């Protein structure tokens, strides 16, 4: 049989256990109350959270893919432009630019259209102005 001190210890351990469980439950509910939302579109339901400019797991799946494509697209365009403009180191700048503009005229229509779509309004104007100044395009 249990004496009085053992009963007190048993009751104290049970109350401590229930208090700990209550604290854990309160913690879980407070975490669940704060719904995670996408930093871009604000959605709270997604099959996968992706990293973005705000931090890891801050974007929903769709926004994360879109963000990654934007970042990749810019770097690939820069690489292509660097490769096409670097050509030969001993040529003059004007000759390499003229060659690039001539290549632009020779390329297929679809690739030229894609390139124009990627360029902004100011970039298109700059390319046309350079083409006019080198005489490869007539007004």
UniProtKB/Swiss-Prot annotation:
GO terms for cellular component: nucleus. It comes from the Eukaryota. A zinc finger (GATA-type) spans 32-86. It is found in: Nucleus. GO terms for molecular function: DNA-binding transcription factor activity; transcription cis-regulatory region binding; zinc ion binding. Keywords: DNA-binding, Metal-binding, Nucleus, Transcription, Transcription regulation, Zinc, Zinc-finger. InterPro entries: Znf_GATA (IPR000679), Znf_NHR/GATA (IPR013088). Residues 67-98 are annotated as: Disordered. Belongs to the type IV zinc-finger family. Class B subfamily. Transcriptional regulator that specifically binds 5'-GATA-3' or 5'-GAT-3' motifs within gene promoters. This is GATA transcription factor 16. It comes from Arabidopsis thaliana. The gene is GATA16.
């Amino acid at each position: 049989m249990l004496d009085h001190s053992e009963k007190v210890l048993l009751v104290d351990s049970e109350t401590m256990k229930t208090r700990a469980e209550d604290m854990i439950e309160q913690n879980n509910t407070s975490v669940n109350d704060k719904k995670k939302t996408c930093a871009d579109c604000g959605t709270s339901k997604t099959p996968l959270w992706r990293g973005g400019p705000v931090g890891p797991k801050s974007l929903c799946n769709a926004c994360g893919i879109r963000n990654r494509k934007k970042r990749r697209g810019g770097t690939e365009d820069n690489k292509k432009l660097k490769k096409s403009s670097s050509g030969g180191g001993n040529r003059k700048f004007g000759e390499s630019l003229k060659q690039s503009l001539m290549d632009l005229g020779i390329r297929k229509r679809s690739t030229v259209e894609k390139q124009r779509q990627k360029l902004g309004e100011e970039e298109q104007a700059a390319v046309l102005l350079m083409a006019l100044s080198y005489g490869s395009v007539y007004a």
